[in-house]
Amino acid sequence: AGALASAAALAAALPAHAAPEVIRIGVATAGGGDPVTWGGSPGGVARNQQWLEEAFKGSGTRVEWLFFKGAGPAVNEALSNRQIDFAYQGDLPSLVGRANGLETKLLLASGTRNNLYVVVPAASDIRAIQDLKGRKVSIFRGTNGHLAAVNVLAANGLTERDLKGINLDTGSAQAALVSNGVDAAFGGYEWFKLRDQGLVRVIYSTQGQDPAFTRQAGLLVRSEFEQAHPGEVQRVVDVFVRAAQWSSDEKNRAALFESWARSGTPVKSWEAEFENQGLAERNSPLLDGFVVARYKAVVADALQLKLIRRSVTVDDWIEPRYLQASLRKLGLEGHWRAHDSRGKPVPGTDSVATNAR
């Protein structure tokens, strides 16, 4: 009752607006499948199960999902043009948008510690990161993978200038690599499908490395929409938290990968991406010390690399009240283990979601 009362008080504290006719959610990937969906985030589960549509059934508000081949930068353009209300987006593009004046709020994490890989054609002589010097390498610039790639290069004594970098989206990079149009590519789980077909080799993986090399993603809302429709924002967050709970349960591991496979990325690829990693650690919605520290590090790195022209703050960009209300309402306070800025578990935050496999 207390949680419901606080949610009601939250809604009452802001000016009343008519319910929106539509809630538009932009997803920073082209996705795949029919209907189009995506994987690697609890949001994909909510999409596949139609939990958001269910939450707004009978309210007069419909839900629209929009997928962007141009990933994070294209989502920023849609936010700027008020074509979407919520965005599932990676850390770098969301902060580039903020630095460029987009008024958004970060509501929750939704797919963290996403791995980065370097792949080469199966017959390539490239064996290590250092071998990329002077080679044609695909990097999807402006995405969260871009900054992670720069950090991996730096850890191996290279800069982006040491490569013949080519800016290609995910699909174009795959076509270029298998036709030897590029010598190597940075990317994510989408490469496992080609690896399993014997077309490419993985020469580097962030798995088991410093989690600072991984990529984070979250759910944002346009500030204007959040201020006008706090009740609807709460409903959306409730659904994403419900999806995070389901996606964090090890009993659902096989079903989760089957759900994500609807996007066209096979189950085997998800098994490889999540190998030796707990679901709860990857699918927690918490904006904990680790997630906040990574977003702050992204600001510093992006500024140094001149990917943004001015620094931006992170602490006041986060709007935690909806997540906190959801955790109370759904009885999930203490469900996920929090991690510190280095990605280590915070003592005393053992949780039911961290059960070992």
Regions found by a protein language model. Give the residues of each.
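Extracytoplasmic "Venus flytrap"
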Residues: 22-48, 142
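Beta->alpha turn/N-cap motifs
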Residues: 27-29, 69-72, 82-95, 143-144, ...
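Secondary-structure end/capping motifs
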Residues: 33, 228-312
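Short helix-initiation/N-cap motifs at beta->coil->alpha
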Residues: 65-77, 90, 158-178
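A ligand-binding cleft/hinge motif common to bilobed small-molecule-binding domains
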Residues: 88-100, 150-151, 155, 182-202, ...
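Flexible hinge/capping segments at coil-to-helix
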Residues: 121-136, 227-231
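Pocket-lining segment of extracytoplasmic ligand-binding domains
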Residues: 166, 172-264
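Conserved C-terminal helix/tail region of periplasmic/extracytoplasmic solute-binding proteins
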Residues: 300-357
